[in-house]
């Protein structure tokens, strides 16, 4: 391959790899393994308020993890609004069917400010580690709607990417607004 792929080319390649991965039947087992590593991390262990997400097809399955940990920590999930992401407290009785039938918090779920979050884990289409000779730098490529691009700068806590191994790439094209992540569980 010559030159760097565009973001759209990477998204198309990931979509094809996602179809193959989902057909393999490994999504649930791999999700449990990845989230097991996340929950053993000191960043998660010390956090009282944790921002997660409800998975869409091809992402690490998080719903049972969030439900289980909501008994011990304040778990938040985003609500997509026209202006971006609102952080809402996870409460099983405040979930409604959202985009593609994915559960999301209703507007009645308690709202949380970004500065209240102690730890966040986020999905992505692709991730890269240590590109351009910067070891430890973790970059994320999203779906192209910039929801997390607008949210991440307002979080003042460790932010981890969670993804299946096929989503790790050598390089991602970066924009000035891209923010590196602190951790990656893959």
Regions found by a protein language model. Name each.
Residues 2-115:
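N-terminal active-site beta-alpha-beta segment that forms phosphate/nucleotide-binding
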């Amino acid at each position: 391959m010559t030159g760097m792929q565009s973001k759209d080319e990477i998204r198309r390649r990931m979509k094809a790899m996602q179809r193959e991965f989902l057909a393999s039947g490994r999504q649930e087992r791999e999700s449990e393994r990845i989230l097991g590593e996340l929950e053993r991390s000191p960043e998660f262990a010390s956090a009282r308020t944790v921002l997660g997400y409800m998975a869409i097809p091809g992402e690490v399955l998080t719903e049972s993890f969030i439900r289980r940990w909501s008994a011990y920590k304040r778990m938040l999930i985003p609500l997509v609004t026209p202006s971006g992401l609102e952080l809402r407290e996870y409460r099983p009785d405040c979930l409604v069917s959202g985009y593609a039938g994915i559960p999301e918090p209703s507007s009645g779920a308690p709202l949380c400010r970004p500065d209240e979050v102690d730890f966040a884990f986020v999905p992505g289409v692709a991730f890269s580690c240590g590109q351009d000779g910067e070891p430890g730098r973790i970059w994320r490529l999203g779906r192209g709607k910039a929801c997390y691009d607008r949210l991440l700068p307002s979080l003042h806590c460790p932010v981890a990417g969670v993804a299946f191994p096929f989503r790790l790439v050598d390089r991602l094209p970066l924009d000035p607004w891209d923010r590196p992540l602190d951790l990656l569980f893959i």
